[in-house]
A protein has these predicted regions:
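Conserved P-loop NTPase nucleotide-binding/switch module
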Residues: 126-130, 136-160
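Acidic, metal-coordinating catalytic cores used for nucleic-acid/nucleotide bond scission
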Residues: 117-119, 195-199
């Protein structure tokens, strides 16, 4: 793993959105059959748990971790021309490709969750291309997050195998989130994993209110939801919420100095 590649990617993302800020409005888009809810954050930050909670609502379909947004955005980033800049047609292309894929899922629900954690890189595209979307960013204690990533060795995430790489990537992530918050104030719903585990009902109420969903008791019984979960967190989200998981790393503190 070489972090230089990710540094260049994150720099390119900031370059695109620093050049000219464009956001689609209602006059630019056709009415969509579905409204996306994007759940993002670092892996092991609680995205699967929130997916399972909201996905237990009777009006919501939990689609899991979809790679489509990344597939549609990355070619644009690679071919970005600073002279031409960033235009509405670029956003419309990403929007239409993504919504066509969501339509192809053929689900009855009008609200669809996409919980690809690393889509935090594309929050700018979410806000700009999907003005109707809801964006939930999961926060968790940094050491708890990084220890959990390191413990489970995420396939495909090269930074997870080395503590120094992991720490450096985490700093890239935090820097980009600060950029998004400054660029799009009040557009991202920040949820803290520790708050959710300490007061599930209150935080679930806040979540549903943000998503413009009425209360559904099923969201408190998310562990009974039979929807398949295909992540490392699959077993955990089939159980009731438990407290204290963010402190487990402390038992290994002496071995986690690079973090």
């Amino acid at each position: 793993y070489a972090i230089d590649k990710d540094i260049k990617l994150f720099d390119r993302i900031r370059e695109v959105f620093n050049s000219k800020l464009i956001v689609l409005d209602k006059d630019d888009i056709k009415p969509s059959n579905v409204k996306p809810i994007f759940i993002v954050g670092m892996p092991r930050s609680g995205t699967s748990l929130v997916h399972q909670i909201i996905g237990s609502h009777n009006k919501v379909y939990g689609a899991g971790e979809l790679n489509q947004l990344n597939q549609f955005v990355v070619p644009f980033l690679k071919n970005y021309d600073p002279i031409k800049g960033f235009i509405k047609e670029d956003l419309l292309k990403v929007r239409n490709q993504y919504l066509q894929y969501i339509d192809s899922l053929n689900v009855n629900e009008k609200i669809v969750i996409d919980k690809m954690p690393l889509n935090f890189r594309h929050i700018g595209f979410m806000i700009s291309a999907f003005p109707e979307a809801k964006i939930i960013h999961m926060n968790r204690d940094p050491m708890a997050t990084c220890w959990s990533i390191y413990k489970y060795y995420f396939n495909g995430n090269g930074y997870s195998y080395d503590q120094n790489d992991l720490a450096n990537y985490y700093h890239l992530y935090k820097k980009l989130l600060a950029f998004w918050r400054q660029l799009f104030p009040n557009k991202i719903f920040d949820l803290y994993y520790e708050d959710l585990t300490n007061d599930q009902e209150k935080q679930t109420q806040n979540l549903l209110k943000y998503c413009e969903l009425e209360w559904d008791e099923n969201c408190l019984k998310f562990y009974q939801n039979e929807t398949a979960v295909r992540t490392t967190s699959a077993l955990q989200v089939k159980q009731k919420i438990y407290k204290g998981s963010s402190d487990v790393w402390k038992k290994y503190e002496d071995y986690l100095q690079p973090l």
